[in-house]
């Protein structure tokens, strides 16, 4: 299992939100490229970059910053936030991203996901499944749908999706621990899963590592790294030392 540091960008700054709430924003740096290089220097093998302006409004005003991040680090970068049509997907790859994360569009227009998989390959397309109380959330987590996350995942599998990013938004930035029950349920799909939301301790990651056999191959860590709850390099050393 790999640990993927999160770099969330809003209005040009590296920020963290709580439960996706803009009013609960903390700015950690005015230089997201520096932050990306920092996590790379601490041993990150992949980065998770989200354009929050894109997620909330659909306008990708941070494109130049994300392009600079991709150029500044020699590790794969997955990029999400407001990617809702084929032009935006192409744009993400053109600026150097290794993976495109699709969220709202996968719910509203799954045909675009199918087209993206056909054009770029299923290994390049990640679908974000964001949920609150088990229900799918879309449009920057502002709208909660009546659809169960597990139902959406099964539909995604039918159209060729192989990798999902699962976030329990009630845990995001709240340090309450990952949604192990939700991950276990989604793992029944046979998908490759990136776990996100709630990680506070290295022990949380050690427990997530036990789900590797169920398809959880990566964990995104955000707030805990920025508040220095633990060191990225310590977490990587601990997780890599565990033999499953």
Curated annotation (Swiss-Prot):
Pfam families reported for this sequence: His_biosynth
Enumerate the subcellular locations listed in this protein's record, separating them with semicolons.
Answer: Cytoplasm
Signal peptide per UniProt: none
Question: EC number(s) in its UniProt entry?
Answer: 5.3.1.16
GO MF, one term, reads: 1-(5-phosphoribosyl)-5-[(5-phosphoribosylamino)methylideneamino]imidazole-4-carboxamide isomerase activity
Keyword Ribosomal protein appears in the UniProt entry: no
Pathway where it operates: Amino-acid biosynthesis; L-histidine biosynthesis; L-histidine from 5-phospho-alpha-D-ribose 1-diphosphate: step 4/9
Q: Does the keyword Amino-acid biosynthesis apply?
A: yes
Record key words, sorted: Amino-acid biosynthesis, Cytoplasm, Histidine biosynthesis, Isomerase
Catalytic residues at 8 (proton acceptor), 130 (proton donor)
Fetch the InterPro entries from UniProt. Aldolase_TIM, His_biosynth, HisA_bact_arch, Isoase_HisA-like, Isoase_HisA-like_bact, RibuloseP-bd_barrel
Q: Name one GO biological process term.
A: L-histidine biosynthetic process
One GO cellular-component annotation of the UniProt record comes to: cytoplasm
Catalytic activity field: 1-(5-phospho-beta-D-ribosyl)-5-[(5-phospho-beta-D-ribosylamino)methylideneamino]imidazole-4-carboxamide = 5-[(5-phospho-1-deoxy-D-ribulos-1-ylimino)methylamino]-1-(5-phospho-beta-D-ribosyl)imidazole-4-carboxamide
Family classification: Belongs to the HisA/HisF family.
Q: What is this protein called?
A: 1-(5-phosphoribosyl)-5-[(5-phosphoribosylamino)methylideneamino] imidazole-4-carboxamide isomerase
Protein species of origin: Endomicrobium trichonymphae
Q: Which gene encodes it?
A: hisA
């Amino acid at each position: 299992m790999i640990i993927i540091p999160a770099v969330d960008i809003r209005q040009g700054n590296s920020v963290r939100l709580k439960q996706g709430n803009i009013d609960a924003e903390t700015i950690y740096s005015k230089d997201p490229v520096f932050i990306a290089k920092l996590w790379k220097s601490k041993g990150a093998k992949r980065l998770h970059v989200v354009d929050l302006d894109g997620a909330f409004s659909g306008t990708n005003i941070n494109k130049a910053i994300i392009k600079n991040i991709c150029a500044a680090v020699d590790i794969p970068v997955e990029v999400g936030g407001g990617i809702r049509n084929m032009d935006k997907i192409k744009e993400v790859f053109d600026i150097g991203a290794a993976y495109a994360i699709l969220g709202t569009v996968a719910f509203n227009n799954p045909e675009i996901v199918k087209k993206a998989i056909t054009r770029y390959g299923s290994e390049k397309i990640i679908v974000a499944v964001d949920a609150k109380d088990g229900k799918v959330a879309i449009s920057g987590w502002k709208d909660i749908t009546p659809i169960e996350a597990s139902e959406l995942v099964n539909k995604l599998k039918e159209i060729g999706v192989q990798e999902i990013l699962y976030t329990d938004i009630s845990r995001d930035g709240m340090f309450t621990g990952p949604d192990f029950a939700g991950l276990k349920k989604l793992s029944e799909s046979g998908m490759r899963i990136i776990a996100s939301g709630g990680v506070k301790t290295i022990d949380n990651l050690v427990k997530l590592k036990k789900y590797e056999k169920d398809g959880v191959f990566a964990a995104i860590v955000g707030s805990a790294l920025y508040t220095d709850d633990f060191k990225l390099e310590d977490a990587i050393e601990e997780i890599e030392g565990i033999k499953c």
